[in-house]
């Protein structure tokens, strides 16, 4: 938050519009005319009909390739896992949920504490690739599997080995070994707190795969496998989102020689391309709705805040893409626009006295209280109030109960009161302790707003007792807020410092004057890592009665998607070429058919 004057004297005009600092953050990188000109052909019925036909054909092949009467039952296990993994990587798994459950139920019945491999259970020739693939799939689908199974694949020196492929030689064997380590790497990302073997597997495979890319042996690795390795290293599970993964794997799998693909593989790839483009067409229409809404709004002409609604829509659509969640995506984007406007208002363009009045107006939900503020602040308040009331009305209608007071108190009031506390600290020159900062810095991430209204529009009935298991006062929601604050400050602390903002890095250095910035970053990144592990546990363990679609929203959008956006810097404040290219591939440019 930028420098804010502590108070306004009695003779000072509250309507002063002078800003304390000029923002150096980007404006709108996307022209509204371009958004409105998007006209995907994939909304035509013929594409949907072809997609539906492919789905039915794949279901038949899916089941025929997993015949329980198959003589080679161990190979059948691996085939099931490979099919499940493929449809998930390609982003078409929502069409095959019953088939996936049948496959994984079968795998789980055959799961062995020594892993999966060739031969009978009594004479098992262990296979780390199959075991890691099975472990990852089962854990992601909430089956109870222990990471201790990986201990079976360590030699006397503690190094991981692949099992049945270790005796083979040549390029084919090397590819199998790389595949094995890649599967272990992907599995090791789905770890829970205290799983030391998973942490060691993650470190071991990360080092191994980096050497593969850097070494001369990379020329011996299949092109598509090399693409998977690059993706795994650049976008580990917490930094990956559904639509970006699907687009990337469509391109990766497209590199495989057509003659080497099975009939099932060809159909899955064709469906993935069609499905991606059909969903993209839906997303473009939603983006056009938001673009028109914003262009017609009273705040469109205000210039004091960042205008990046395309990036905000991408934030959610890249993680939750299903057509039935259209209302949540539109609401999410509108809320993010409001939050950015308020963020920059509190950050740059208000004196402390003005912000106190503005916050009191929010607390009382009363526009008359801001009458004496500058025109741009009044416009901002009136638009915020109008839009908030509209979104609350949608939520009340969806839930069939009056939740207006609950939303006001637990979302907007909590968010802006935390911002006001920051403003007071900065105005008085106070640098809080690390713990004080985080106690206030978690609600001012705005996750309390983003994790409430869109949840209520997900199509699930959420009485307060259920809502409290995923929203306030749940540990799960606290972890979402904490992870958001930590990654924001760790990736953006220098820019925040230059901008006059507080960060947990600055507060840590005040508490530990003997420490360096590197020490502070290590501490914060350590906390972030622990936070993400606990979130894994909360998300993947069956501990509550929260509908799965709601847990997926909170976890994928507010946890993983934020890590994705910050993976290469701050993708919100300074939308760089990387983010722009990702938006293009996910929302604008269709997959070539």
UniProtKB/Swiss-Prot annotation:
Gene3D superfamilies: Farnesyl Diphosphate Synthase, Terpene synthase, N-terminal domain. Its EC number is 4.2.3.56. Mg(2+) 3 binds at residues 488, 496. Its cofactor is Mg(2+); K(+). It is an enzyme of class 4 (lyase). Mg(2+) 2 binds at residues 343, 347. Belongs to the terpene synthase family. Tpsd subfamily. This is Gamma-humulene synthase. Mg(2+) 1 binds at residues 343, 347. Involved in defensive oleoresin formation in conifers in response to insect attack or other injury. Involved in 52 sesquiterpene (C15) olefins biosynthesis. The Asp-Asp-Xaa-Xaa-Asp/Glu (DDXXD/E) motif is important for the catalytic activity, presumably through binding to Mg(2+). In sesquiterpene synthases utilizing farnesyl diphosphate as substrate, magnesium is more efficient as cofactor than is manganese. GO terms for molecular function: magnesium ion binding; terpene synthase activity. The lineage of its organism: Eukaryota, Viridiplantae, Streptophyta, Embryophyta, Tracheophyta. A motif (DDXXD motif) lies at residues 343-347.
